[in-house]
Amino acid sequence: MLTGVIEGFYGRDWRRDERATVMDWIAAAGMNTYIYGPKDDVHVRARWRVPYDAAGLARLTELRDAAAARGMVFYVSLAPCLDVTYSDPQDRAALLARVDQLARAGLRNLVLLFDDIPSVLPEADRHRFDSFAEAQADLSNMVLRHLRGAGHVVFCPTEYCGRMAGGDPRGSAYLQRLGSTLDPAIDIFWTGPEIVSEEIVAAHLAAVGEVLRRRPVIWDNFHANDYDIRRVFAGPLGGRSRDILPLVAGWITNPNNEAEANFPAIHTTGAYLADPDYAPERAIAAAVAAWQPRFRLAFGDGAVPSDLVALLCDLFWQPFALGPETTRILSALRAALTVPRPDPSDPAWRAALEDLRDLKRRINKLFTLMTEIENRDLFHTFHNYLWEAQEEVGHLVAYCDWLDEAPPPGAVFPATDRIHNFYRRGFGVAVQDILQRDRQGRYHHGV
């Protein structure tokens, strides 16, 4: 079963040393696969017809050798999907020329990507193919035949999640056709019911396997953050029970853009795949213990304490939730603020305020220690996120301290002695102000 990481995000690709580090983490987590497919490499997607030069090809063979030295399989991605004419002899020859160049270099394990494009068969192909899926399958089958059994192919479909299949994978004409025409030796990626799936359950995967006529390989975007540059995810893999594993042919995580942020994602994914009793909270505790040595301070023998590394994970937990501690503190404060004016003598208010003040102190301590760590890539990975966390919690504490002073009716916060110029502004915020959303992110107009 394929298990590991795909470098498949939109954004700046990883450096050579970052890829080596990620490979170390994959191997330590007991997984076996590294897939090279950064959108930032123009030879993968934007200029898929153009072969690598000697230096580019050497970089890939070096990565293959690095993966092999760790007992891992290395895949290279090609994404002809942006502008290929599936029936055009020149395009088909160009794709095979790319495959030949890679194969001659010993790079015979390929991923063919047809994701994030319109689900429309090009006009020029309609004389030969009766469906988009048939055209993609024909091109992919051609690649597999060309490899003559010397390599493996994984296919990423255009409909790669339940939402894109109209919520009903079994009823998707695209998936039906793909399942019936794509060579059974080619594996197929699937992200779950959503692009970023909060949960993946057995009934869903059974339906997917039925329509694809094979078990899918999960492309897990749970820790991906390329769709929201304001967030990073350092919590454990969640929302996936172990009973789904017999229904898949592999599990590949597509994690954060920032390589240094991905130790928890990789460590807990490996734990999920290996541990029959996997529990996210226990997995993240083990990940924190194993990750802490990377937080060594630049001077002396110390490191950021494990409780503060755990706080880092808690602050930047998962795409659908804050960490348990942060959730508890903010939930208690939200409840205490439901009254127009909190009573400074109310025990619930006092407890919520003290917990918030303590959270602020610990975030400040974490922020300061992170500026002093030796690993500057790790520092810069989290610096902007921690800066925002420190500023926002500081502002919240200042407001609650002001309320705790029992200000007179009609008083406004912040007063002139309060700093308030970090209020978020800009184009994105202006758009969001127009589109008023509820707590689930849904829009309502005129209600």
Curated annotation (Swiss-Prot):
Limits of the GH84 domain: 1-277
Protein's name according to its UniProt entry: Protein O-GlcNAcase
Gene Ontology molecular function, alphabetical: [protein]-3-O-(N-acetyl-D-glucosaminyl)-L-serine/L-threonine O-N-acetyl-alpha-D-glucosaminase activity; beta-N-acetylglucosaminidase activity
Family label: Belongs to the glycosyl hydrolase 84 family.
Keywords: Glycosidase, Hydrolase
PANTHER family per record: O-GLCNACASE, PROTEIN O-GLCNACASE
Alphabetical GO biological process terms: carbohydrate metabolic process; protein deglycosylation
Record EC number: 3.2.1.169
